[in-house]
Amino acid sequence: MTDYKDTLNLPQTEFPMRGNLAQREPEMLAHWEAAKRYRKLREVCAGRPRFVLADGPPYANGNIHIGHAVNKILKDIIVKSRTLAGFDAAYIPGWDCHGLPIELQVEKKIGKVGHEVDAAAFRKACREYALEQVDSQRQDFKRLGVLGDWEKPYLTMDYQVEADTVRALGRIIERGHLMKGEKPVHWCVDCGSALAEAEVEYEDKTSQAIDVRFRVEDELDLLRRCALDGDGEGPISVVIWTTTPWTLPANQAVCLHPELSYALVRVGDERLLLAEELVEPAMKRYGFSDARIIGRCQGAALEGALLHHPFLDRQVPVILGEHVTLEAGTGCVHTAPGHGQDDYIVGLRYGLAVDNPVGPDGKFLPGTEFFAGESVHQANGHVIEVLRERGALVLAEKLRHSYPHCWRHKTPIIFRATPQWFISMEQAELREQALKAIQQVQWVPQWGQARIEGMVSGRPDWCISRQRNWGVPIPLFVHLETGRLHPDTPALIEAVAQRIEAQGIEAWFSLDPQELLGKDAAAYQKVSDTLDVWFDSGVTHATVTDKRAELGLPADLYLEGSDQHRGWFQSSLLTSVAMRGTAPYKAVLTHGFTVDAQGQKMSKSKGNVVAPQKVVDTLGADILRLWVAATDYSAEMAVSDEILKRTADAYRRMRNTARFLLANLTGFDPARDMLAPGQMLPLDRWAVDQALKVQQKVTGAYEQYQFHQIYQRVHNFCSVELGSFYLDVIKDRQYTTKADSIARRSAQTAMYHIIEAMVRWLAPILSFTAEEIWQEIPGERNESVLFNTWYQGLFALDASEPMNEAFWATLLDVRQAVNREMEKLRAAKASSLDAEVDLYCEPALAETLEGLGEELRFVLITSYARVHGAASRPDDAVETPLEDGTSLWTRVTRSEHAKCPRCWHHREDIGASSDHPELCGRCVENVAGDGEQRRFA
């Protein structure tokens, strides 16, 4: 038997079937770096319209985790897709480099400031440590395939950025937003510092909840207020309820709601006052069965009544506040303005003292009666003891409730009044302006707007000062007597900023005030506080986005995890509005957190942590990138080894599709061999039209940041339109027709258009694989797919031509029906080419199918395909309902004809040629004649 293998156009490509991504990706990265890929891309994109994505800086401490990987990959997908859409989309990565976590790490190495090391040496060590962390994280981010200016990232500890951070503070001061105040702030005794809102986490905690009697000083006055002449004897007390007994030494008042009804309740030989709605549950808790309401009044009627502190020798007033609720307790709120935000606000109205008997270490100050030197959390038991001894305790019980904790130490925090610097939310109308600015921004998902509006509406003034060493200084001089800022503060801030540009923050810490103030120095105190790190990152719109030539304000997009509504999105918004009256961004996109396959939070103790480093070292970065793109990031993002394995399977489908296309473009030179649409076969025009429809979906989804839709559509295109139909059908034409025939060049033209488009669809997501594909596509090309824009060579199928989209949709439907019957043959170890198919249908469908003539068999991939009227169907024909509501009857039989060894079709004309007796007629034509003619498929 003659071997006809050399007469076939068998697929050939250098593009390997296996990705071997873990090995190949680092080689590609090294090549891109050597070729200065990012720099060249900037040159290619110069002059295009800008797209600015501002990078929220990760903290320069520790290894990157899967959440970091998700964030950086999403940003990279956006930047690359905007580049392909024709924008100049630079990416400047950044790092947050100051603050407590770095201090804690450095303390472990060299000790605490003032003990083992001086402050300047400590800050130097912090800078060195942060730089090491940046270098480590930078390598991990680059390994993910993230393209950016890794040689010139921004660091919040860069001298220039530190200087511009100080200038940003100066601008905020000039516009009237800074204030000094003794206010209660979140305070972590372990940090020894105030915490920002974003540094507070709420966790469940068991506390001592107590109900306490505050004796009424003038009982007759109170009875008059309750419209009572009197009801027996016995003391009258207002009962408060609190879960922080340790704050009672700082009590200055008891607060009631002006519009609630309060009841005077007779219990045994005493009378208690509390909210009427809470009388029944309270008496039940106390175990008082003989309680009887003897009088009522509105809260407003009790304003100004005097009570006696339960264990200190002082009177406290009844005051009114809208914050009092009936959710728990008694409706009477113990008020200590030094230990709570609501207490502080209501206390301002009544001129109450902001008393804070607690030191920065969380211990009561010397001179605090009863409790001096005790830790506040340990003092709860002692407070209860003192109350019990004085007969002031009604009830003490344990309560499990949500309580603020330090995000670093995971320990309960306290509210503590301290002298701090604040960005005021009311002064100069910052809150009002910020709420207006929020409405000008596009929030994705949309619920983000309501979330940040709620947070900005309800948030307290922003405490921006910290009592730390490693941070940007608050470079102010305060008059020792008046407490006012130096009158030349703007000029002084600029002078300090210029010094910081040259020497870093050490320029402030080592500064002798006389150098700037001259003889005034003796009258002023140099502020030693540092800025909250959320201020550092929050002003990057001014220190980075507005300063780097390739960026610019406002940023088109901020993209971070959904926790950043209370973090970076908010600190950026407030500082930008404070500085220039507008938001720093046009759109804000948030992604959910990563969880395991069961929806559980990841933790080392559960053993469910997925480390990005391990994923890229085993599966490759493109698999991780594909998982990110395939997952709806608007909700929680589930990841596990099994999920990543499924992602790798999907990757293989797309890779194999690309490989098939490339392998069948062997010998094709687009400049020489590409056909015009009118010269192409209808099936090939249909394939290009399908690719165009996919491209419209893909580019639209990239624009809307709906990456999971891209994954679904492209994967589906590879599996269904291409894998299950088009590529299957054209194999025969590709392999068996003459190499330079119109039939083959038509299919190659379609495949060329498809791979040119597809490589661009994949490039933002499968960055390594796309570049690998790019190098193998025939024809002249530049060095990177990213140096191009979306492919413009696709074209639509003319709806007026006979073989339009509806025609091919019908063919697909028929083919599926035939395939179901073919499966029975395959189960018997036969192929569809071993079969002959008879189709029985109504006239309209028969006309459609007959339109393909002899070529129907190629579409159905069978040796013979015959069309008959429905009425002539035999009993063993199998009925299949079609999409249009009609029926098709199919009969599949084994062919009795000989099999052509070249095309594997069973044909009756085998042996007709004496020169090639084994071949079928068309193979003879393709081997020895002018080649077969194909008109449709």
From Swiss-Prot:
Taxonomic superkingdom: Bacteria
Molecular function GO labels: aminoacyl-tRNA deacylase activity; ATP binding; isoleucine-tRNA ligase activity; tRNA binding; zinc ion binding
CDD domains named in the record: Anticodon_Ia_Ile_BEm, IleRS_core
Reactions the enzyme catalyzes: tRNA(Ile) + L-isoleucine + ATP = L-isoleucyl-tRNA(Ile) + AMP + diphosphate
GO CC term (a single one): cytosol
InterPro entries recorded: aa-tRNA-synth_I_CS, aa-tRNA-synth_Ia, Anticodon_Ile_BEm, Ile-tRNA-ligase, Ile-tRNA-ligase_type1, Ile-tRNA_ligase, M/V/L/I-tRNA-synth_anticd-bd, Rossmann-like_a/b/a_fold
Function as written in the Swiss-Prot or TrEMBL entry: Catalyzes the attachment of isoleucine to tRNA(Ile). As IleRS can inadvertently accommodate and process structurally similar amino acids such as valine, to avoid such errors it has two additional distinct tRNA(Ile)-dependent editing activities. One activity is designated as 'pretransfer' editing and involves the hydrolysis of activated Val-AMP. The other activity is designated 'posttransfer' editing and involves deacylation of mischarged Val-tRNA(Ile).
Protein name per the record: Isoleucine--tRNA ligase
Organism for this UniProt entry: Thioalkalivibrio sulfidiphilus (strain HL-EbGR7)
Record gene name: ileS
